[in-house]
Amino acid sequence: MEKEAQTYLRLKQFVAPFLGFAVNINAYGTEHIAQEGKLILVSNHRSDMDPFILSYTFPRYISWIAADYTFRIPIFKDLAKLAGGIPMAIDGKISMASIKMVQQVFKREGVLGIFPEGHDYMVQNDFFAPMVRFHEGFAAFSIRNKVDILPSVIVPIEESYSDIPIPSLVRSFMGMPQEVCDIKRRSIYKKVRVLYGPKIDHRPYLEGKLEDNLKKLSDEVRVRMENLQRTQVV
């Protein structure tokens, strides 16, 4: 993973000045970010800009979980692979190769980044709606690998909306799911707040039935994130 981390950091150094110029980004609660140790970073997902916004404010290398179809997008697929991106099917299924990649992240005490909503919020295409239902894969990673979760949220202060630059037919030829081909609009951030909360201890969720604990942990993370969205900062 050292090569991927170096590629990630080089890309971050290249992109950061342009992103910082285009978007007014303010981060709060960064004192909650542990400087070392394995961790799962979760956030809401309302724009294709989200991983870049979070990476801009997060000081450590993030191994991002991404929908497997994004690894078929020209240019992006190569950058994602070089930077250590980990593909996952939109139905939540994950290949053995990807599971091994996740385990390697935790073995080296790294950070796994994942959006519990998947692409569902963007598919819904209502940018004023609350977060959609969470997929519980991130909770399974936490419990099975005994890893704490760091909740975060991206709160748009100013944004605009534009048509998806890739036509629907082209997206279909690229192998994207129909619901992704049907997305009409995307959010373009102008000013955002990124808020990090205290990490959530995985240990209370190790005892008892896994299925019950997945829901409990997922619900706890959602509540924490909703509270962060309502946090007033000055």
Model-identified regions with their sequence ranges:
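Amphipathic alpha-helical segments that form well-ordered structural scaffolds
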Residues: 13, 17, 53, 141, ...
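C-terminal/domain-terminus segments
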Residues: 206-228
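Soluble catalytic domains of membrane acyltransferases
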Residues: 4, 21-202, 208
